[in-house]
A protein has these predicted regions:
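Intrinsically disordered, low-complexity regions
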Residues: 43-45, 134, 185
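Secondary-structure transition/hinge residues
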Residues: 22, 104, 181-185
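A short hydrophobic/aromatic micro-motif that marks alpha-helical segments and, especially, helix-coil
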Residues: 23-24, 138, 176
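RNA-binding accessory domains that recognize and position tRNA/RNA substrates
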Residues: 1-3, 9, 17, 160-185
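Flexible gly/pro-rich beta->alpha loop and the following alpha-helix that scaffold active-site loops
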Residues: 3-72, 77-83
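Pocket-forming structural segment of enzyme catalytic cores
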Residues: 56, 61-65, 70, 77-168, ...
Length: 185
C-alpha cells in the first residue's frame, strides 16, 4: 500500500490533509515537523501549511528525501525559500474563495484542473519568485504564483488548500500527487 507522510507544520488543516489521503485508500501518517526524515519510510511527503516559517522544524530536510514532495500553503513557501526562490507578504491576506487559472494541462499536479478551478486560500505570505528549475503552473488575481512544479525533482506546491471542502477539485490534486508517487515507486 502506498504510504504518504504529512509533515505537520502546525497548520489549521493538517488533519484534513491526512484524512483526504486516507479517503483515497493510502496509508497516511501525520508526523511532527521535528521528526527526522531518516526515521520515515514513505512513498511521498506532504509539507503541510502552518502559521510561521520560523516553526517549520526539520521540514526542509524532507526536500532531500528522494521521494515526491507536495507543499501546501506554507509548505509551498518553504520549498521556494529553501531552494532559492523568494517569499513575501501578499497584497491580499486572509481567507478567500479564489478562481485559479491553470497554465497548462500537462502539469502532473494541477494540469487536470485546467483551464481554471475554484479554491480556498488562507494565507498572508506567498511565493514571489520561483526557485531555479520550477515553473509557475497556476495563478490568480490575488496571488501570481498559486502553484509551481519541478517535475524533474518531483517537487510541487500549491498555495491554496486542496484538503478543504471549499476547494472544488482538491481531491484531484491529491490523486495527481499519488500518481506521481506511484510512478516513482
Amino acid at each position: 500500500m502506498t504510504c504518504i507522510v504529512v509533515v505537520d507544520n502546525h497548520g489549521q488543516f493538517t488533519h484534513l490533509e491526512g484524512r483526504a489521503l486516507r479517503d483515497l485508500g493510502v496509508d497516511a501518517d501525520i508526523v511532527d515537523n521535528e521528526t527526522p526524515p531518516e526515521e520515515v519510510d514513505a512513498d511521498g511527503v506532504v509539507l503541510s501549511g502552518g502559521p510561521d516559517m520560523d516553526r517549520v522544524g526539520r521540514a526542509p530536510e524532507y526536500l532531500e528525501a528522494d521521494v515526491p514532495v507536495l507543499g501546501i500553503c506554507l509548505g509551498m513557501q518553504l520549498i521556494a525559500e529553501e531552494l532559492g526562490g523568494a517569499v513575501d507578504s501578499g497584497d491580499y491576506g486572509g481567507y478567500a474563495d479564489v478562481t485559479v487559472e491553470v497554465e497548462t494541462d500537462d502539469d502532473p499536479l494541477v494540469g487536470s484542473l485546467a483551464p481554471e478551478t475554484r479554491v480556498w486560500a488562507s494565507h498572508a505570505d506567498e511565493v514571489t519568485e520561483l526557485p531555479d528549475g520550477f515553473v509557475r503552473t497556476a495563478g490568480s488575481d490575488v496571488c501570481n504564483i498559486e502553484a509551481m512544479s519541478d517535475p524533474d525533482r518531483e517537487l510541487y506546491g500549491v498555495q491554496w488548500h486542496p484538503e478543504v471542502a471549499h476547494t472544488e477539485e482538491g481531491e484531484a490534486v491529491f490523486e495527481n500527487f499519488l500518481a506521481v508517487c506511484a510512478d516513482g515507486a
